[in-house]
Amino acid sequence: MARSLAAVLLLLVAAAGASHAASPAEMYWKIALPTSPMPGAIRDLISPASSVGSASKEDTVGNVFFLEKDLFPGSKMTLHFTRATAGAALLPRGRAESVPFASERLPEILSQLSIPAVSPTADAMWSTLAECEAARLAGETTKHKHYCATSLESMVEFVASSLGTRDVHAVSTEVISTLTPTPRQAYRVEAVRPVAVPGGDMVACHGMPYAYAVFGLHGLKGAGGGRVPRGRGRARRGGGGIQEARRGARERGHLPLPASGRHDLGAQLN
């Protein structure tokens, strides 16, 4: 049965854009997701400045929760937008698959990546591995799929499989602050533009602390999306937003990410 599907990938991330010659990862993106330019937040993770070996100390989720009723021109809210796995490299699939990704093999992983066993990075990596394994054990439901992507290719394939389409448009927030960690501060919303998501499906994605870029992906149903073209505040300019029908607090470090779609693929790469 043929039907037109369009997806919006809400990459709620904090990163500044950069321009350079097309890399193999960018070429892959153009082929795999031809209808969407690669967001600067992803491009930054494949740039030469990115590296393997240290997990960001910045909270990768931040304080980004708000209610739909509070999102209107002139409204004020205090939020914390963080960078996407700051400084961590997004590995090619071949390289990522050559490194184990299991808590029981953490000593081997640390040895391969030359990371001290007693270090903040090792602790952060163990926490991420444990969270990914707990999600796998919990299994999938009709409303929620979870996957930890260790490469650009695995992230894109999960998105396309979850939504049943490669017709994806990526949207990202942008943080212009040079401070590390990024500041938690007050914003005033200047404009809001809804994003049509008639299919009701979305994949949300957020960065996870690790020695290289790892993203938690959540295939979900039942949320709406919107864009906030401008929000007054020194650290942020523009971005995407998602509102979920089920409002809940973060539980054991899990972000209650929503999903909705024109098929709306919401990825919070934070």
From Swiss-Prot:
Domain BURP: 65-270
Short name of one Pfam family: BURP
Tissue: Expressed in leaves and shoot.
Signal peptide residue numbers: 1-21
Entry keyword Signal: yes
Swiss-Prot/TrEMBL keywords: Signal
Residue numbers spanned by region Disordered: 225-270
Compositional bias of kind Basic and acidic residues: 244-254, 261-270
Domain of life per record: Eukaryota
Record SMART domains: BURP
InterPro entries, per the entry: BURP (IPR044816), BURP_dom (IPR004873)
Name of the protein: BURP domain-containing protein 1
Organism annotation: Oryza sativa subsp. japonica
